[in-house]
Amino acid sequence: MRKGKRVIKKIEEKIKRQVTFAKRKKSLIKKAYELSVLCDVHLGLIIFSHSNRLYDFCSNSTSMENLIMRYQKEKEGQTTAEHSFHSDQCSDCVKTKESMMREIENLKLNLQLYDGHGLNLLTYDELLSFELHLESSLQHARARKSEFMHQQQQQQTDQKLKGKEKGQGSSWEQLMWQAERQMMTCQRQKDPAPANEGGVPFLRWGTTHRRSSPP
């Protein structure tokens, strides 16, 4: 039978808790020592018991003080780097915001100029540049208008051609129907004439047949 997952929780019994602490502490220090030797790492272990008693272990290649100083130095370097990174980000955000605000102001001014307001605030060169810009925009608008009108005319022409083709198709069908009727009429004229009520066939044009006299 498979055992369930063991639940880790605080040992309430004091004596049992102390015994477990002693065993686990010894095993932990042993594992730390093995890790420092096998992997050649600088390792420090600090333990405060429930009664605030200090236990520590440090690998032979260094001391606990050196490890703590190195740790503090690394943390300060990381904090400084993070602070510098965030400062650079904030500075970039401020610059981007200022650039966008200037762009918005320029757009507002351009809109006012298109409405004819604020022209008295422009210099001669600015007025000349604005005039050239308006002429260029007007040329583009006229070109687009001509293109649009050409497309409209082309569509109307295509629709008219389709209507004519449809009408020609109907006329052609009518002509074919009339031709078939004429062919049927000619065919009936070529067939032998039907017999009259007395059983004697009618005479055809261009033939001479005499009715035989009765005996």
Curated annotation (Swiss-Prot):
Instruction: State the Gene Ontology BP annotations.
Output: fruit development; fruit morphogenesis; integument development; negative regulation of cell growth; positive regulation of transcription by RNA polymerase II; regulation of timing of transition from vegetative to reproductive phase
Q: Which InterPro entries match?
A: MADS-box/MEF2_TF, MEF2-like_N, TF_Kbox, TF_MADSbox, TF_MADSbox_sf
Question: What keywords does the record list, in alphabetical order?
Answer: Developmental protein, DNA-binding, Flowering, Growth regulation, Nucleus, Transcription, Transcription regulation
Q: Tell me, what is one Gene Ontology molecular-function annotation carried by this entry?
A: DNA-binding transcription factor activity
Pfam families to which the protein is assigned, alphabetical:
K-box, SRF-TF
Q: Where in the cell is it found?
A: Nucleus
The protein's superkingdom reads Eukaryota
Which PROSITE patterns does the record associate with it?
A: K_BOX, MADS_BOX_2
Gene Ontology, cellular component aspect: nucleus
Identify the stretch(es) annotated as Disordered. Answer: 143-172, 184-215
Any keyword Transcription regulation? yes
Summary of the tissues where the protein is detected = Expressed in bud pedicels, petals, anthers, style, ovary, seeds and embryos.
Q: Which SMART domains match?
A: MADS (SM00432)
- Domain (K-box): give its ranges: 90-178
Q: What is its main location?
A: nucleus
- The MADS-box domain sits at 1-61
Q: Which PANTHER family match?
A: SERUM RESPONSE FACTOR HOMOLOG
Q: Miscellaneous notes for this chain?
A: Plants over-expressing AGL63 are dwarf, have few rosette leaves with a curly-leaf phenotype, and display small disorganized floral structures and addition of carpel-like, resulting in small abnormal siliques with few seed production.
Q: What does this protein do?
A: Probable transcription factor involved in the regulation of fruit growth. Contributes to integument development. Controls organ size via cell expansion. Involved in the regulation of longitudinal growth of the fruit evenly throughout the radial axis. Functions redundantly with TT16/AGL32 to repress nucellus growth and promote its degeneration.
Q: How the protein assembles, per its UniProt entry?
A: Forms homodimer. Interacts with AGL16.
Q: What is this protein called?
A: Agamous-like MADS-box protein AGL63
Q: What organism is recorded for this protein?
A: Arabidopsis thaliana
The record lists the lineage as:
Eukaryota, Viridiplantae, Streptophyta, Embryophyta, Tracheophyta
